[in-house]
């Protein structure tokens, strides 16, 4: 189904294939969803495809490219652990974190330049911003992996094959790259949008480093509000490009 949805977004599905997919998504799959928002999204997938057809060609190309990468990563995730319980190399981890998150930072950067031009960020920094966007996305996904690694291991899925501390340090570097990325964007709203997940990720990492048992860590709501204020403060001034 995942690959069928990817083909539909790419515009490669026949009318019969689309009809079959819509029936599956709006029927059994939607009924099986406990989250109402996810149920609605599946039921309205056809509307998403219709909206895609109304968008500028350049934006459609960006969307199709990032969806293809994400589908590839999620498909890998669904099949890789059928006959193994741990990734075989750090390269596997880096590839996976790019496919499910790093590519989104790259996409968001490209979309920003496509729709806003120099108002998004200095054109001279485009390549650097794309690279930083990839690292930022990877950092956020690494936080998910580090936070959930005990639960994942219990299900026979380990996304890391080397020292956890090294990956914690790498995640921190990537998230700080995200803060730098956000500080260079051209408007308060853009900077604020990036600062919040970066700060939440760093706070979650601090909890991961300090946990003494198997408990799943979560940033307290009061701390989230404080981080929002901090993000607003950091977003007031734009860093020189």
Describe each PLM feature range.
Residues 1-140, 146-241:
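Catalytic cores of Mg2+-dependent Asp-rich isoprenoid enzymes
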